[in-house]
């Protein structure tokens, strides 16, 4: 069974998808972390000067695809975690994700991960492009102001003001929805959930009610 959760940044996709996978005992794939791994790698020496095509043809990074364990990212064997959470990496990932060769590379990896069976995928084009035949498709949304407040809590103190982060989110929304290849759209057949005024538990409860009739 494949469940996809798409939506813009700050809607709670990662938190919800991870909690849902835990509740259902499904595998969880944070596809945003995959793009951020590439972006982080490209920001480091000696890979900074490499063309992206060369970097993805011979990637120094890798991902763990192990059933029952969350996807983990490694750079030359070293586990990446907090390094992927900076705004610099997020901005770089947004730019790289517009490249068709990058999206094709990532889509192949994501479909490979799906071979584990019973997966929750979260991202921006999971239900529209990568898994259009997913069993359940969710599109999470929230106001830009609420999303900025949420993202601010995840960033180091004083790294960005709420106003600056709000502007970054609006800019990211435009880039994601207007990009030529696989833009952020509401997938056909997806159920739209506005999480602006809902807690994580409330959103999870709603999704579980939608998923339960489809469980194997």
From Swiss-Prot:
GO MF annotation: an example: ATP binding
Pfam family, one: Cytidylate_kin
Signal peptide: none
Localization per Swiss-Prot or TrEMBL: Cytoplasm
One of the GO BP terms on file: pyrimidine nucleotide metabolic process
Catalytic activity: CMP + ATP = CDP + ADP; dCMP + ATP = dCDP + ADP
EC number: 2.7.4.25
CDD domains assigned to the protein according to its UniProt record, in alphabetical order: CMPK
Keywords: ATP-binding, Cytoplasm, Kinase, Nucleotide-binding, Transferase
Binding site for ATP: 7-15
Source taxon at top rank: Bacteria
Gene3D superfamilies for the chain: P-loop containing nucleotide triphosphate hydrolases
Family classification: Belongs to the cytidylate kinase family. Type 1 subfamily.
Protein known as: Cytidylate kinase
Lineage, opening ranks: Bacteria, Pseudomonadati, Chlamydiota, Chlamydiia, Chlamydiales
């Amino acid at each position: 069974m494949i469940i996809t959760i798409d939506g813009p940044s700050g809607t709670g996709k990662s938190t919800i998808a991870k909690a849902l996978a835990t509740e259902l005992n499904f595998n969880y794939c944070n596809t945003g972390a995959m793009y951020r791994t590439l972006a982080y790698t490209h920001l480091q020496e000696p890979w900074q000067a490499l063309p992206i095509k060369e970097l993805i043809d011979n990637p120094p990074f890798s991902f763990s695809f192990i059933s029952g364990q969350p996807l983990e990212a490694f750079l030359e064997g070293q586990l990446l975690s907090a390094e992927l959470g900076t705004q610099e990496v997020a901005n770089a990932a947004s730019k790289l994700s517009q490249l068709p060769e990058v999206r094709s590379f990532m889509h192949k990896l994501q479909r490979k991960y799906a071979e584990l069976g019973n997966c929750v995928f979260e991202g921006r084009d999971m239900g529209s492009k990568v898994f259009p035949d997913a069993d359940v498709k969710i599109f999470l949304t929230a106001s830009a102001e609420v999303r900025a407040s949420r993202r601010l809590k995840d960033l180091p103190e004083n790294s960005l003001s709420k106003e600056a982060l709000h502007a970054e989110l609006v800019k990211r929304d435009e880039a994601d929805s207007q990009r030529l290849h696989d833009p952020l759209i509401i997938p056909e057949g997806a159920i739209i959930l506005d999480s602006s005024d809902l807690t994580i538990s409330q959103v999870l409860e709603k999704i579980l009610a939608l998923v339960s009739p489809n469980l194997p």
